[in-house]
């Protein structure tokens, strides 16, 4: 452990300290003068540290911080508040320099010192626990948990900082994958923020945004939507126009609208947040890049593939300049570009980009990484689209095995790959193996997320489509009916998935001879698809073909 007292002190400060230690201070005026000078020296050192830090001179700031610790310990006592705050600042600078072991040791010393000087439940000690917990959470969530939980446990019910500690614990639980506990804790934190600071306080609004994001990450789109729609007007009332939380919340709500099929509202919010983020932070800011990427996905969803390609290309070109060709973000951009080329039917271009993306991902992150698994999956889908089943199947199986190993057999990505394997078997005409896999993934998603979760419903829809292809119409009908009803409620009647389920329900009814119901549903799907996607979209053309076939039968 580093010996703070070994650092060289400025000569004047050293002389002052010697006088402080040796004199009995019979001259009160002189004693006050010496103490005032020590205080002035310490304050000047803090100003110097801040200036060096702002200039980006972290090594200079570190030297000054070490001197500030030495001065504070000698002049005011090793257990003084000034010494403790100097130690915490020193730890923070070590953290900025990525000297994590040194930072950890200093935080531990600071905590021990504060407990000895003020007690474990003192405000000063809780502040050290807060900072130490945040430091640990940035490097290891498991190590951080007991520290953050202890700070919360020791907090009094009427302590204004208790709400912040609840939020920190919630973030930590989310990092640990304990989502239900995180949601409960963040809900409590939000109530505490509202009670202590009011609904329009910036910290309250930030907690609302975090809870909404947590809902969204679980697929709870309605809960997330309501919270964002409640928070945004309040944010716009009390925060500055270009505030990051406002722009990020607009982007998040736009993404929710996209998933719900509210494409016009989604595009409007995406463009608003994009314009605001560019004005506030510039074209190369991470938030700007994220908005462009999601806006491109919106254009993919609505069949505006050239617009999608344009935005994905913009993101790729900026990442290429800022991060270089071998960076994972650049590889992700190539993956996105390849996905659009696949949709455009340019399979040769798409395959080239997917393989380049995969090579970069493996080189940068290793084969056993979630990012590499994602690109493997997309490449396998492309091979399947081309009927290259012998190449697609081993790649799907490899991605599935890796995902199960690194993320767990019940992780959403692993389950999505199992679903894709089922679809591959369906494409090959192996309906028996396909059905087995679909039912397996439905069971797992039901256990993990519930029967009405969007992932579970998507798998059920796929099983119903398999039954449709296998002429098992009586088995397909109740599933399509259920999925359409729940998707209408969850995603809205104009969502792509909802319209797909409605159209397929019409096809089943046609095959069962229920021609009136079939016409009603296929016509409704055609009207919705034309309104949302236009006349030339593949989904619209599918409905046109289905209604034409129905009229021939009639």
Identify the role of each PLM range.
Residues 2-15:
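Bacterial N-terminal signal peptides that target proteins for export
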Residues 13-24:
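Bacterial N-terminal signal peptides
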Residues 27-63, 70, 81, 85:
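N-terminal leader/linker segments that initiate helical-solenoid repeat arrays
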Residues 43-54, 81-96, 123-137, 160-175, ...:
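Conserved alpha-helical positions within TPR/SEL1-like repeat arrays
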Residues 58, 100, 141-142, 179, ...:
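TPR-repeat structural position
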């Amino acid at each position: 452990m580093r010996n703070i007292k070994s650092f060289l002190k400025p000569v004047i400060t050293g002389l002052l300290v010697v006088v402080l230690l040796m004199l009995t201070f019979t001259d009160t005026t002189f004693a006050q003068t010496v103490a005032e000078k020590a205080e002035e020296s310490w304050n000047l050192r803090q100003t110097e540290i801040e200036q060096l830090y702002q200039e980006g001179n972290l090594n200079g700031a570190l030297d000054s911080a070490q001197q500030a610790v030495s001065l504070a310990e000698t002049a005011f006592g090793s257990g003084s508040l000034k010494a403790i705050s100097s130690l915490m600042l020193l730890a923070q600078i070590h953290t900025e320099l990525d000297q994590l072991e040194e930072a950890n040791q200093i935080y531990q010393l600071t905590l021990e010192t504060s407990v000895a000087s003020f007690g474990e439940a003192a405000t000063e000690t809780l502040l050290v626990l807060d900072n130490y917990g945040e430091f640990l959470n940035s490097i290891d969530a498991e190590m951080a948990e007991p520290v953050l939980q202890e700070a919360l446990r020791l907090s009094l019910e009427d302590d204004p900082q208790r709400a912040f500690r609840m939020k920190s614990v919630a973030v930590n639980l989310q990092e640990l994958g304990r989502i239900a506990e995180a949601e409960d804790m963040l809900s409590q934190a939000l109530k505490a923020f509202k009670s202590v600071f009011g609904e329009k306080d910036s910290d309250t609004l930030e907690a609302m945004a975090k809870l909404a994001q947590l809902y969204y990450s679980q697929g709870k789109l309605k809960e997330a939507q309501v919270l964002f729609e409640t928070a945004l007007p309040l944010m716009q009332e009390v925060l500055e126009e270009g505030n990051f939380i406002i722009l990020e919340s607009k982007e998040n709500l736009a993404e929710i609208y996209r998933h719900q099929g509210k494409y016009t509202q989604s595009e409007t919010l995406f463009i608003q947040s994009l314009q605001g983020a560019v004005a506030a932070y510039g074209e190369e800011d991470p938030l700007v890049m994220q908005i462009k990427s999601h806006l491109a996905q919106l254009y993919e969803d609505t069949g505006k593939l050239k617009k999608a390609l344009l935005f994905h290309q913009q993101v790729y070109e900026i990442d290429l300049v800022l991060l270089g060709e071998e960076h994972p973000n650049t590889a992700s951009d190539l993956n996105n570009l390849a996905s659009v080329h696949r949709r455009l039917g340019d399979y040769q271009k798409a395959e080239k980009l997917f393989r380049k993306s995969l090579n970069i991902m493996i080189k940068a992150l290793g084969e056993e990484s979630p990012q590499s698994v994602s690109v493997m999956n997309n490449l396998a889908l492309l091979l399947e689209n081309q009927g290259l089943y012998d190449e697609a199947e081993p790649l799907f199986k490899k991605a599935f095995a890796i995902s199960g190993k690194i993320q767990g057999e019940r992780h959403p990505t692993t389950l999505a790959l199992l679903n894709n394997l089922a679809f591959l078997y369906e494409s090959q005409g192996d309906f028996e193996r396909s059905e087995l896999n679909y039912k397996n993934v439905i069971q797992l998603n039901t256990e993990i997320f519930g029967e009405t979760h969007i992932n579970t419903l998507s798998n059920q829809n796929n099983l119903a489509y398999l039954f449709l292809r296998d002429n098992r119409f009586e088995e397909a009908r109740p599933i399509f009916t259920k999925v359409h009803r729940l998707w209408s409620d969850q995603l809205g009647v104009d969502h792509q998935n909802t319209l797909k389920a409605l159209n397929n329900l019409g096809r089943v009814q046609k095959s069962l001879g229920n021609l009136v119901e079939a016409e009603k549903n296929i016509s409704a799907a055609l009207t919705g698809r034309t309104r949302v996607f236009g006349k030339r979209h593949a989904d619209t053309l599918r409905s046109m073909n289905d209604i034409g076939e129905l009229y021939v039968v009639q």
